[in-house]
Amino acid sequence: MANLFWKTKNKTISLLESPFKSEEEFEKTVFGTSELLEEITLIKRQIRGGNKAGIPDIIGIDTDGSICIIELKNKSVDASIIPQVLEYAIWAETNPDSIKSLWLELNEKPEDVEINWENPEVRILIIAPSISRSSLEFVQRINYPVDLIEIKRWIELDNQILMVNKLETEEKGYRIRPVKGLRIYDEDYYKSKRNKTSVVHFFKYISEVEKIIKSKRWNLDTKFNAQYCAFKSGFFIAFRVKWLGTKSFAFVYKIPKKDIKKFKITPTRYDELRKEFIFNIESGKTHTKDFIPLFEYCYKSIGGN
């Protein structure tokens, strides 16, 4: 069991890892921490009816419009879990109408997600306190995108510290095979979906943000999907440049309402569903450098220095 040393200005506190007491507590913690699955809209939990085998307990839709099969286990898991989640993925591919019905029943769902119900893409997420590294070899051999995510917990009085570790196939030099249906979100892709001139401006602003990140020496990676470009540190998104339509796009920041008054720039609007502020970008008029205080705030909020 791992120890965590929490060093403050006055003292160093040694914390023991605090395993989750039950599957229910583990699930409650995962779904109660919105940052962990912020790119996924949950359709329903525990949808299994009767004793039907092969139907997953937790299903969601991500910002790419992919069906997400989420498997939570409050125990160490190894490669033996792969056949089970593959069965779930096959069910999702062959029963899109069942998932579509659940999606349409949602009262609150993002309007900008495009889902191909005729030929859906499926993504698998396996979440557990500990995942055997041997699972990586099996994951890279199957034709579905798979995320292996470890979550451990430490407790100090009323505070919880969560360690989130997304296992990567590069860790031990495993040969990476292309995943079936995995899209490449480049300039050509966006031009096939959006206004071509707007796409050029979209990438111009992304380049300007990347220059700021480089000058500040921030540890952020640029990640594209169908709806936005995210600047991420590991598992967490610091900020985004997001499409609002075929022509318009915006800077997006997850900032508490009470803190937005600290900044001189007025947001265009607040997204109540996603709890984030949207600042529309006017090509040629919006200056990226004016948003540096917002970039800094959001980077520090995910633990950046």
Predicted features along the sequence, with ranges:
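Charged, terminal alpha-helix-loop-beta segments
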Residues: 1-305
